[in-house]
Amino acid sequence: MSNHLEAKMGDIADTVLLPGDPLRAKYIAETFLENPVCYNTVRNAFGYTGTYKGKRISVQGTGMGIPSISIYTNELISEYGVKTLFRVGTSGGMSPDVHVRDVVLAQAASTDSSIIHNTFGGGIYYAAISDFGLLDTAYHVAQDLKISVRVGNVLAEDRFYNDEMDRQKLVDYGVIATEMESTALFMLAAKYHVRALSVLTISNHLMTGESTTPEEREKSFNDMIRVALDTAAKA
């Protein structure tokens, strides 16, 4: 048991999917995993362990934002020995090359958060990147599943409502989507020498105004989930 998880040692698999929405964790477990068992209900951050294609996999809700995912990632790795982590969640499209419902594989995560400064001090602008092996596997899994994916740099923002952001400049420099967690996930994976990747779905487009419904964001986006799970099964 850790500060925020009531699981016992052995309850959580070595490989974990991390949706921000706890209800998406429940949906993934009940829809895709065989014999899912709930190991956590603390703060309604539901966590489940089951099997997928013969591999033991857990799904843990993290909540939104860098502080929240940092708590769960730290505890999963340091207290429960998790070795491979996949963020699965929504993102906002920014590039004209991505569209609503597209799947994005985050190669790297830029940020406007102070987490890098607080970790490394002034003068160091750390590049938070995903694990190349997971990224490569996920890309080829998507090809095998005939699921179109976009690979690129995403922005992990501290604020969901951020009208001051110069998004066009970010697009000009190759940022394809925005979300709120991946920088922390990639940094912690690097710190603890484990593997991490973010597999995202474009739920809305910040430039065009396209959007999906709240129900879709909770209970669909199955292409993203299948890519993450099939990659996890091979990891």
UniProtKB/Swiss-Prot annotation:
Which residues of this UniProt protein bind phosphate? G20, R24, R43, R87, V88, G89, T90
Identify the GO cellular component terms for this protein.
Answer: cytosol
Note the Pfam families from the entry: PNP_UDP_1 (PF01048)
- Enumerate the residues binding a purine D-ribonucleoside: H4, E179, M180, E181, S203, N204
Q: Where is this site: Important for catalytic activity?
A: R217
| Protein origin, superkingdom | Bacteria
Which PROSITE patterns does the record associate with it? PNP_UDP_1 (PS01232)
EC no. given is 2.4.2.1
Keyword Membrane in annotation: no
Entry keyword Glycosyltransferase: yes
Q: Which UniProt keywords apply?
A: Glycosyltransferase, Transferase
Q: Which InterPro entries match?
A: DeoD-type, Nucleoside_phosphorylase_CS, Nucleoside_phosphorylase_d, Nucleoside_phosphorylase_sf
Q: Reaction catalysed? A: a purine D-ribonucleoside + phosphate = a purine nucleobase + alpha-D-ribose 1-phosphate; a purine 2'-deoxy-D-ribonucleoside + phosphate = a purine nucleobase + 2-deoxy-alpha-D-ribose 1-phosphate
**Subunit arrangement?**
Homohexamer; trimer of homodimers.
| Family affiliation | Belongs to the PNP/UDP phosphorylase family.
> What protein does this entry describe?
Purine nucleoside phosphorylase DeoD-type
- Coding gene? deoD
